Amino acid sequence: MMILKIGGSVITDKSAYRTARTYAIRSIVKVLSGIEDLVCVVHGGGSFGHIKAMEFGLPGPKNPRSSIGYSIVHRDMENLDLMVIDAMIEMGMRPISVPISALRYDGRFDYTPLIRYIDAGFVPVSYGDVYIKDEHSYGIYSGDDIMADMAELLKPDVAVFLTDVDGIYSKDPKRNPDAVLLRDIDTNITFDRVQNDVTGGIGKKFESMVKMKSSVKNGVYLINGNHPERIGDIGKESFIGTVIR
């Protein structure tokens, strides 16, 4: 069983509002369509989520301006999600959109609808999104957060994160030409020893992956989504990426 997250930096131009990389979406989905044990897909927002969230003060207190922003961010994320869903349907897959904003009940997320879709043979697709945190504030639940929840609920064999880098390095490869790609990381390592922030968020992602490992049987993988065919090399000597065991 595999769960997989497509990073927003892979399928959007993060510097240009609501600009999708449609070729990347199609190439990734083409690979995903051949994975029989893929049970859940999550994707980030990139320029469909972050830009307007920052502009309207999300996450943050509930007020007239942030409420408008809430609607805009959710609409934009739905539009990006529809592109992913359309590509999956075109490849013969059975996706079903399950927005995280609709799963919030009594201060927690209830994934019962998502699990039911998996049991029925569908591939649920969720994404980082806004949600009503309480009567006074709005929150944002990231794709990484959803992946952590899915790992705990489903106990998959493999969890995969597709990003715009080849993996986690020993040092920042942009500043250190001698940086080495860490192909296999023991969970006892600390990020202080992995002096890398090649995307501006690898540190946080690394921590999320380490926390997930206890719920994933055969490793949490970080793979360059611009080369989705590398998913097929998981477990092989030729694999390029990072696995946390």
UniProtKB/Swiss-Prot annotation:
InterPro entries on file: AceGlu_kinase-like_sf, Asp/Glu/Uridylate_kinase, Fosfomycin_R_FomA-type
GO biological process: terpenoid biosynthetic process
Molecular function terms, GO-annotated: ATP binding; isopentenyl phosphate kinase activity; kinase activity
Known function: Catalyzes the formation of isopentenyl diphosphate (IPP), the building block of all isoprenoids. Has lower activity with isopentenyl thiolophosphate (ISP). Has low activity with dimethylallyl phosphate (DMAP), 1-butyl phosphate (BP) and 3-buten-1-yl phosphate (BEP). Has no significant activity with geranyl phosphate (in vitro).
Enzyme's top EC category: transferase
GO cellular component terms given for this protein: cytosol
Protein name: Isopentenyl phosphate kinase
Binding of substrate, residues: G45, H50, G143
Keyword ATP-binding (UniProt): yes
Temperature dependence: Optimum temperature is 70 degrees Celsius.
Quaternary structure and interacting proteins, as annotated: Homodimer.
Superkingdom, taxonomy of origin: Archaea
Keywords per UniProt: ATP-binding, Isoprene biosynthesis, Kinase, Nucleotide-binding, Transferase
EC number(s) stated in the UniProt entry for this protein: 2.7.4.26
Catalytic activity line of the entry: isopentenyl phosphate + ATP = isopentenyl diphosphate + ADP
Family: Belongs to the isopentenyl phosphate kinase family.
Activity-pH behavior: Optimum pH is 6.5-8.5.
Classification via Gene3D superfamilies: Acetylglutamate kinase-like
Site (Transition state stabilizer): K14
Annotated ATP binding sites: 5-9, 46, 164, 169-174, 201, 205
Pfam families: AA_kinase
